[in-house]
Amino acid sequence: MYSQTHQGQHVLMNGGQAHQRFGMQIPKFQSQGHHHPAQQPHHHAHHNQATHNITHQHNFSSGALAAATPHFTPSHMQNGAHANVDEDIDESMNEHWQQQLQLAAESRQASSPHYYARAVAQQTKGIQIAPSQPDGQENGTDNRNGTVKTKSKPRQGWHALDFGGQGLRALSTSLFNYVFLEKLYLNHNKLKALPQTIGQLRKLEHLDLSGNDLTELPEEIGMLTSLKKLYLFDNNIRTLPYEMGYLYRLDTLGIEGNPLNDILKSQIMKEGTKALIRYLREEMPVHLPPPDRDWVILDDTSSSTEKVTVLSHNALCDSSATSSHFGYTPSRALSWEFRRELILSELRSHDSDIVCLQEVDQGSYNGFFREQLAYNDYKGVYWPRGRAMGMQEEEAKNVDGCATFFKGSKFILLDKQMINFGQTAVRRPDAKGQDDIYNRLWQKDHIAVVVFLENRLTGSRFIVVNAHLYWDPAFKDVKLIQTAILMEEITKLSDGYAKWPPCTDKTAFRFSEAEGGGESENQPEPAPSMEYASGDQIPLFMCGDFNSSPGSAAYNLIANGRLTEEHPDLEKRLYGNLSRVGMTHPFKLKSAYGSIGELSFTNYTPDFKDILDYIWYTSNTLHVSALLGEVDKDYLQKVPGFPNFHFPSDHIALFAEFSVKGKKGKVVEADFGPQRS
C-alpha cells in the first residue's frame, strides 16, 4: 500500500530510487471508486503540473551502485541481450548517456522477484504501514508509530504494483482495469508484447518494462500522458511509435540495451529524453481522421415545419493555445493558421443558420472569419471582452470575445447588445457595500453577446445569446453570479423585444442585405412579423462555454429557473439581492443535448474531460429535432487530448436542429362581418 506519511524517507538499500511505500501483502484490491483526483475544468489552468512528491528518482547511496562506473555492462542479461553502447560516439559520455548507463545498471540489479516491493518492505521495517484490516477499523485514531491518523473520506489506499521477476509471458486484461495505478513494475519477465489496453492506465507516472523480450510498443502507450519515468532497458526494441510524442511530462526514458535505430538513439544520447519526445511529436504523421460524428435524428417531422439550425463552439484563441498548456500537441497542429482553417471548414460543412463562437480575438474576427464567412451568406456581430477598452488598437486585436453569425438571406438583424457581467453587477442598486462584487466579480471581464433576429420568410423572431463564463473552479460563486446576471439581463431584453415594432418592408431588407438578389423572384412573399405577448414567448437560444458541469449551481439555475440564496456555491459571500433573496428567471430552458443525456464530453484534454458547453433553448417555443453526436470512441483510444490535426480546439462543436413550435403570441381573430343567426 501507498502511504503519504513517510514519503521521501526510504531510499532503497541497493541505492535505487526513493519511493512512497507500497506493500504487496494485500488480501484484495481496493475499489478504485474512492479515488477522486482533483481536476481543473478549463484549458487555461488544467495543464499546470503538480510538483514531485518525492526526491530525485535515483538517489545513489554509498552502497554497491555508487561505485559502479557509467560503463557497467554485465556480460549476460536476463533476456540474453548485451549492453548496446557505441564506444565510437563521442557524445556517449555526456550527462544524458551517463544517466542512461547508471539507470540501466540499477535496473539489472533488480531482477529478483518483487525486487522493489521487497526493498521497500525492508526499508520500512518498524514503521506502521496502513494495515490490511476490516473496513470498520479504517477510521481508527491510534497508530502504532505514535502518529495520529486524521479521519478523512475514503480514498484509494494503494497506487503501485510490482510484478517484477515473475517469468510472466502474458498479462491479464483485468490488470488494466486498475486505472488508479501510478507505478507499475513489469520488469525482468518474458513479455513479448504489451497489450493495447495499457492505454487505460492514464494515471501511471512510473512504468518499468526492463528486461523483457519486447520488440515494439503499442500506439496506445501515448495515452499515458502522466508518465514521468518509462524504463525499457534490455529489450529488443528497434523503433518507437510516434504516439510517444504525446508523453510531454516524460522526464526519463530508459532505452539502453535495445538495438534502437540510429536516429532515435542519437536524439536521446545527445539531447536527452525531452528532445527525443519532442522529435517524435513534431515528426508525427497525420493519422486518418475519425469517422464523421453521427447526425442523430430525434424527430423526423414534416419538412414544412419551420426549422432552425444552431452551432456553438469555443474556438480556443491563439493567445491561449500555448505549448505550455498543450504540450501534447504538435506545434503545427497548434498553430492558429492551421486551426482557423479547420474551424472554417467545419463551419462551412455544417452550414448552420446561426453560429456562436467563443474565444475569437478581434484580429481573427475582422481579418479572417467575417471575411471568409461572408462568402457563405453569413453576417456577424462581435464584441471583445472588457479588457479591450482603453487598449491601443494593435494590442486590442489579441483580446478574445464572442462572435455570432447568422444567414443574411434568412434573418434580419433587429437588435444587438453586449452584457459585461462585472460592469453590470457594479451598476446594480444593491451593489453598494458588497465587497465581493468588486473584489471577485468586477475584476472578471467575461461577456455575452445578444442578437435579436427575425426570419424574413416566416416572421418568427429569435433571441440568440452567445456567452463565455469564467473558468476557475475556485470561483464557483463568480460563475453562479455571472449566470444570474445573464438571466436577469436576458429577461429585461426579452420584455423589450416583445414590444418591438414589426418590420414594415422586408423586401427592402432582403434585396439590400441578401446575396444573389436575382434569386428572390422564386421566393414566396414574406409573412408579417410575428407578435409575442411576453418576452418568455419569444424563441430563445442560449449558447456558449459556461464552464459549468451538469449539476453545478450555474447549470441548475438555468435548467430549473431558480436557486436558493443559501446555495453552498455562494460560500456565504455577499452579492446584494442575489445572495439575499435568491435567483430566478422566467424561461423554460432545456439543454439541447439533454435529449440524449448530454455528450460524454465537450472539453477533452489529458487531465480533464467534462461537459462545459451547451445550447440551451426554450422548450415552450422550440423542439429539438436532430443533434450532432459523439466523437468516435475507437478514435479516442489513441488520442489523449485535443487540439490535434482533426480537432482545432480543446472544445468540440455542438450542432443542433430545432423545430419552431406553433405561435404563442397574440391571436388576431379574422373579421367576417355580420353573420346570420
Swiss-Prot record:
Quote the Pfam families the UniProt record gives. Exo_endo_phos (PF03372), LRR_14 (PF23598)
Extract the InterPro entries matched here: CCR4/nocturin_mRNA_transcr, Endo/exonu/phosph_ase_sf, Endo/exonuclease/phosphatase, Leu-rich_rpt, Leu-rich_rpt_typical-subtyp, LRR_dom_sf, LRR_R13L4/SHOC2-like
Cite a GO CC annotation.
Cdc73/Paf1 complex
The protein's UniProt keywords, in alphabetical order, are: Cytoplasm, Exonuclease, Hydrolase, Leucine-rich repeat, Magnesium, Metal-binding, Nuclease, Nucleus, Repeat, RNA-binding, Transcription, Transcription regulation
E.C. number(s) listed in UniProt: 3.1.13.4
Concerning SMART domains, the annotation shows: LRR_TYP (SM00369)
The signal peptide stretch is none
The protein, known as = CCR4-Not complex 3'-5'-exoribonuclease subunit Ccr4
Per the UniProt record, the source organism is Aspergillus terreus (strain NIH 2624 / FGSC A1156)
